[in-house]
Amino acid sequence: MNALLAANAVAAVAGIAFALVGGARPAALSESGTPSAGERFYGWMYATRAVPLGVAALIAPLAWSGPASSLLLSAAAAAQVGDAAIGVATRTWTMIAGASLLTAVHTATAVATV
């Protein structure tokens, strides 16, 4: 269980880091030359949702176990499924792989904390 909690913590921190990069430097993740105003807007919109969810996914399984922690981790996993689907739609293989890995880690931790 400790290894799974550590993996979940790393996954949550990675998700937070990518959200912060997406908010601060959206072109770094979208690989566009100069981000448009809309791209910057959506980068910040993504970060304002992903950072709190990532922090909650990091803290919840460490603070308590049970249905509440499992539900929160399931929500984090669902968000990563969405990110993976966006990766599939845009053929961004690193996004597919990263989001799929984070989905698996959050899901496994959710099952283990019930």
Label each PLM-derived region with a short phrase.
Residues M1-A6, I59-A68, A108-V114:
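Helix-coil boundary and interhelical linker segments in multi-pass alpha-helical membrane proteins
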Residues L5-S30:
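N-terminal signal-anchor/start-transfer transmembrane helix
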Residues V13-V21, G38-L62, S74-A78, G82:
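Core segments of alpha-helical transmembrane spans in multipass integral membrane proteins
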Residues F18-G22, A85, A89-T90, V105-V114:
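Membrane-water interface at the C-terminal end of transmembrane alpha helices
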Residues R25-Y42:
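Interfacial loop at the N-terminal end of multi-pass membrane proteins
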Residues R40-T48, A99-V114:
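Small-residue-rich segments of transmembrane alpha-helices in multi-pass membrane proteins
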Residues A63-W64, L71, G82-I96, V114:
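Membrane-helix boundary connector in multi-pass membrane proteins
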Residues L73-A84, G98-A110:
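Hydrophobic alpha-helical segments of small multi-pass membrane proteins
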